[in-house]
Amino acid sequence: ALPICRRHVIGGVIYMEEYLKTLLEQIRCKKAHASIYHEIRGHIEEQVADNIAEDMSKDDALKAALNDMGDPVQTGVEMDQLHRPQMAWRIIVAIGILTLFSILIQYLVTRYIPDNNAYFFRHHIFNAIISFSAMIVVYRIDYSLIGKYSKWIATIFLLFFAFQIFIVEMRLNGTLYMRILSKVLIMSPLFFLYVPLFGAILYQYRGKGWRVVPKIFIWMALPLFLTLELPNLGVTISLFFMLASLLTIAVWKGWFTFHKKKFLTAFWGISISFPIASVAILMQTGKLALYQIARIHALFDPTVENHALQTLRSIVTNSAFIGASNKKSLLQEGQNSDYILSTLSAYYGILVALVAVLLILLLIRKIFQISSSQKNQLGMMMGYGCGIVFFVSAFWNVLVTLGLVFPTYTFLPFFSYGGVTMVVTYILLGIVLSIYRYKNVLSDTYMYKKNWDVA
């Protein structure tokens, strides 16, 4: 029930709560009632205070304030047009166009894959249909439910993958997979779904001090520990920067009571220096295998002989701005997935690869715009999490394409071949669309009313 204000106008004819009740009856979206109630009541009380300052009595001040608000039925009808779920048709259409472009890209790439080109192309279309459908389903879900039960969802998420990794342990060529029904799915990209969950967990710790820092670090460390078992260093590094970026945003926005500059300086100082120092010590003490040392040398020394790195660098340096390269035959495995940008550069020119990257950057920009415009801090943080996943994934893919980091598992959102990566991409987009859908409905007032700010 809404709080009741017993102050009345002359003669006790009209009460403030009656005005608000009548107004709210015109608004069909029940989830918007709490935020609208507090917003309108705040306006009325501010106007009452101003009227009293002008030597009005309390009753006259309230009567004048309610008169200024206008007829509650008319005002409620007008607010009903604003405070309702928004249909993001333009964004959905834009995503649909981008999906069609990704299908075109896969057609242009898979036509050069011998024997199985038709299979890969048909499978990509099937994945696109399934993924787009998943996006629409998530879009229709109220994202605040994810925020409300974020810790439970994260716990189930981590336990499920721990079971898959340590109990089931289905490995193919050293990489962990899992089976759902008759499908064998790669596990790595699914961990990126944890990022918006982590943003929702941070939301629940707002207003706390140093005592929640160990809890936050545990929620960060658990998925990172699991990714080390995949094994996939690229996923671990990417996931760390995604989670660390969200934590940095939350701290910088003053969500916690501890000193933000001191915390961030210590956090990033340790995060950067500790891995470097650890690798240096392991190399000096001979704890690393020869192939691991060779990979580290290849990463920082372009003259070191490494077939994969040399191939990627050769493709980039020999690609034409428009048209095919004489090095296009070098790249075979992963040409339509991990190394999609290298393939586009080799077969069609750097311009086509740049267009693909530009489209993704425009999408990322839109995601951050939607997130930063949210009045609801939960929606803002979960939206940032989705945007960060896209940015880090695309950035890492570009680094691999340019031969600047050692080739490891990577994908370019939308364009890389793979059912799991595509579903993950569209689920994250569904969360962003849900945030947009409820932008004028949910507020932090609603969250506080539901007692979500728990330890």
Positions of PLM-derived features:
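Loop-to-helix entry and N-terminal half of a specific, functionally important transmembrane alpha helix
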Residues: 370-409, 415
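Hydrophobic, glycine- and aromatic-enriched re-entrant/interface helices and adjoining loop segments
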Residues: 260-355
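Alpha-helical transmembrane segments of multi-pass inner-membrane proteins
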Residues: 162, 186-250, 431
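Hydrophobic alpha-helical segments of polytopic membrane proteins
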Residues: 217-222, 234-282
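A juxtamembrane structural motif centered on a specific transmembrane helix
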Residues: 404-405, 410-455
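Cytosolic juxtamembrane regions of integral membrane proteins
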Residues: 58-115
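Short, small-residue-biased leader/transition segments that mark boundaries at the very start
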Residues: 1-2
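Hydrophobic alpha-helical transmembrane segments
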Residues: 126-131, 346-367
